[in-house]
Amino acid sequence: MTSAPTKGAAYLVLGMHRSGTSALTKALSSLGTDLPAHVMPGDEHNEAGYYESWPIAVLNDQWLRACGSAWDDPFAYPLNTLAPAQEAEWTTKAAELFDEEFGDSRRPLLKDPRVSLLAPAWFDILEAKGFEVRCVISSRGPAAVAKSLERRNGFSLQRGVLIWASYMLAAERYSRGRTRVFVAYEALLEDWRREAGRVCRTFGDPEPEATGEEAVDRSLRHHAGAE
């Protein structure tokens, strides 16, 4: 049983790896939401940065392995069910780590594609803390995502598409019936302010003010012709 929302709103960015979740999170972070304390740095695959909690990503990886799965499992959805005692152990670890990463934030912004697969547990954790859960789902075509995974991880295109399907099925199914909005990667690159405004209207938040600052770098798009 979850608590009635009293603490604020928690924003969860869901979706597949290489589908624009980092760019979307950067845009949302300009709207008064709070990033975690220990943000994963950028690298040669994502120079602008990942905008996600490094410790939470590590925990989610371990959690998936405990379920007999992994972030790159083409058949991760639906996850194997853990015994109640095991599930409670992982939930407690995640809840404590969330507090370490976000402190007293009333508008935490949690992004890790793995959360898409673990969403039911994360929803329960956040609602137990008194947050209203708001889902923002990043979408990008499977061919483009598979091409990006082929380049970064050496996966076959077929495997990349299957992983994409697993994540997107999980993100859609688990967020169904909740307050959510889908943001297409192409639309975000074309006009991030327009998409940010649409997110704000969905959640009843103030729309972003017009500034000269660009939250999304269009030049970071990869494999543009694959979609």
Model-identified regions with their sequence ranges:
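Glycine-rich phosphate-binding loop used to anchor ATP phosphates in small-molecule kinases
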Residues: Q86-F123
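Conserved phosphate-donor/acceptor-positioning beta-strand/loop module used by diverse small-molecule
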Residues: K111-V115, K129-L149, W164
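PAPS-dependent sulfotransferase catalytic core
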Residues: M1-T91, H222
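Short, well-ordered alpha-helical microsegments
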Residues: T21, S116-P120, W192
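A structural motif corresponding to the C-terminal end of an alpha-helix
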Residues: L97-R106, A170-V181
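Short glycine/proline- and charge-enriched loop/turn segments
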Residues: E150-Q158
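Generic beta-sheet signal
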Residues: A9-V13, G103-D112, V133-C135, R180-V181
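The conserved 3'-phosphoadenosine-5'-phosphosulfate
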Residues: M40-E47, I137-K147, R176-E227
